[in-house]
UniProtKB/Swiss-Prot annotation:
Protein name: Probable small ribosomal subunit protein cS23
BP terms from Gene Ontology: translation
Subunit structure, as described in the record: Part of the 30S ribosomal subunit.
Keyword Ribonucleoprotein among record annotations: yes
Species name: Prochlorococcus marinus subsp. pastoris (strain CCMP1986 / NIES-2087 / MED4)
Lineage summary: Bacteria, Bacillati, Cyanobacteriota, Cyanophyceae, Synechococcales
Length: 126
C-alpha cells in the first residue's frame, strides 16, 4: 500500500475545491488504514481512496475494548467488491498495528508509531 500521506498529497483540487485525480484499480492500494492512537485503546478504520481523496469505508473499531480485528474483518467481508488480496492486506496491517500497540505501543508516542507504519494514517493523543 502506498503511504496515506503520499496518496492524499498527490490529489489535485479543482477550481471548486473538490479532489480529483486517479482512482486506483483493484489491488493498487485503494484503501487507507486509519488509526486513532490512545493511551488505553487503539481504534482502526478503513477509508477508500476515490478520485484522489478518501471516503470512510468502515466505522472505527476499538481494541481491546472490543474485538476490533474481528469486527473489521466482518465488515470487509460484507463488501463483496473488495478483493481477497485487499482484505488480507488490510487485516494483516491491522494485526501488525494491534500487536505493536499491545507489545510496545502503550509506552510509545504517536510520532514513533507514525514512523513505524508510514503507510497508515494516525491521529490521537498518546
Amino acid at each position: 500500500m502506498m503511504g496515506a500521506n503520499a496518496v492524499l498529497a498527490a490529489a489535485k483540487i479543482d477550481e471548486d475545491g473538490v479532489p480529483t485525480g486517479y482512482t486506483p484499480k483493484p489491488d493498487e492500494g485503494r484503501f487507507i488504514i486509519k488509526i486513532l492512537w490512545l493511551p488505553d485503546n487503539v481504534a482502526l478504520a478503513v477509508d477508500q481512496i476515490v478520485g484522489g481523496g478518501s471516503s470512510p469505508l468502515t466505522a472505527y473499531y476499538f481494541w481491546p475494548r472490543d474485538d476490533a480485528w474481528e469486527k473489521l474483518k466482518s465488515e470487509l467481508e460484507n463488501k463483496s467488491w473488495i478483493t481477497d488480496n485487499e482484505r488480507v492486506e488490510i487485516l494483516n496491517k491491522a494485526t501488525e498495528v494491534i500487536n505493536y500497540w499491545q507489545e510496545e505501543g502503550k509506552t510509545k508516542k504517536l510520532e514513533e508509531a507514525k514512523l513505524k507504519f508510514p503507510e497508515v494514517a494516525f491521529c490521537g493523543t498518546a
